């Protein structure tokens, strides 16, 4: 195993093999213990219809049910956050039918995103790029979730897992902003195994993952964006041998996105002196 590969696996807490049933129990227990320690009233999570939010959502609902068994009143709000009309709305509804949240609400982010875009144009005399606008979409979605969380004393749940963390494939202070991460340490295929254990419809974990943030490239897959296959990323994270060019590409993305995995830098930090900057 490569030295940096071993360090990454350790830092991201990835296990080479897992027991899906035990992982579900452990992660639900984490959610239960954390919400009680925080003195919060439950969870809020944006549900898109993909693998990650489907899994995180089901874990949240199971945690709320566990809390009820312990005599603790808690709620879980699943939030639909479309930009105008979501092309894969059927998948989102399928995810909700699997998650079975106690409450579902919808916040259309289009006016918020366009408002930021209009103010940007007025202030700087230019339009945002499609990439910048995509990041605004992710950040407005998180603003909406924190508005709900702040009003109702809930915790915002993130969907980041090891395969995203190693590549930095999320928007800083967008989908990368959350109070807790119940999928942390899982590779993509391990998350899929948990969904299979939980009886999720195959569509939710077989569809090609996509952030779907770009107007000019709707439905662009994560793998096309990354230039890497999740199967290779998973092999790397699980300590398996991968082609050298693949390992180099993964390690380069990890080093370039270190800033995303850190709290804001201060003059007392030194992690940034060795690099750690990317998109």
UniProtKB/Swiss-Prot annotation:
Catalytic reactions on record: deamido-NAD(+) + NH4(+) + ATP = AMP + diphosphate + NAD(+) + H(+)
InterPro entries, per the entry: NAD/GMP_synthase, NAD_synthase, NH(3)-dep_NAD(+)_synth, Rossmann-like_a/b/a_fold
Signal peptide bounds: none
A single Gene Ontology CC term: cytoplasm
Stored CDD domains: NAD_synthase
GO terms of molecular function: ATP binding; glutaminase activity; metal ion binding; NAD+ synthase (glutamine-hydrolyzing) activity; NAD+ synthase activity
Highest taxon in the source lineage: Bacteria
Subunit structure, interactors included: Homodimer.
Family of this protein: Belongs to the NAD synthetase family.
HAMAP family with a match to the protein in the record: NadE_ammonia_dep
Protein name: NH(3)-dependent NAD(+) synthetase
Protein's gene: nadE
């Amino acid at each position: 195993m490569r030295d940096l590969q071993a360090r990454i696996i350790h830092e991201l807490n990835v296990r080479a093999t897992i027991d899906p049933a035990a992982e579900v129990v452990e992660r639900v227990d984490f959610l239960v213990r954390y919400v009680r320690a925080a003195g919060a009233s439950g969870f809020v999570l944006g549900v898109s219809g993909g693998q990650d939010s489907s899994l995180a959502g089901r874990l949240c609902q199971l945690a709320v049910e566990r809390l009820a068994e312990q005599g603790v009143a808690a709620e879980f709000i699943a939030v639909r956050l479309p930009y105008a009309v979501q092309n894969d709305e059927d998948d989102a509804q399928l995810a909700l039918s699997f998650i079975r949240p106690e409450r579902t609400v919808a916040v259309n982010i289009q006016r918020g995103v366009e408002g930021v875009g209009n103010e940007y144009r007025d202030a700087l005399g230019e339009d945002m790029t499609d990439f910048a606008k995509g990041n605004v979409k992710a950040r407005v979605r998180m603003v909406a979730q924190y508005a709900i969380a702040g009003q109702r004393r809930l915790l915002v749940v993130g969907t980041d897992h090891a395969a995203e963390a190693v590549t930095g494939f999320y928007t800083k202070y967008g989908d990368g902003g959350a109070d807790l991460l119940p999928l942390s340490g899982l590779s993509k295929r391990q998350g899929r195994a948990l969904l299979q254990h939980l009886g999720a419809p195959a569509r939710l974990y077989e569809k090609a993952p996509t952030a779907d943030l770009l107007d000019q490239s709707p439905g662009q897959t994560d793998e096309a964006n990354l230039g890497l296959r999740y199967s290779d990323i998973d092999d790397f994270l699980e300590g398996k041998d991968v082609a050298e060019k693949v390992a180099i590409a993964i390690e380069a993305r990890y080093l370039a996105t270190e800033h995303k995995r850190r709290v804001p830098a201060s003059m007392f930090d030194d992690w940034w002196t060795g690099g750690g900057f990317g998109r």
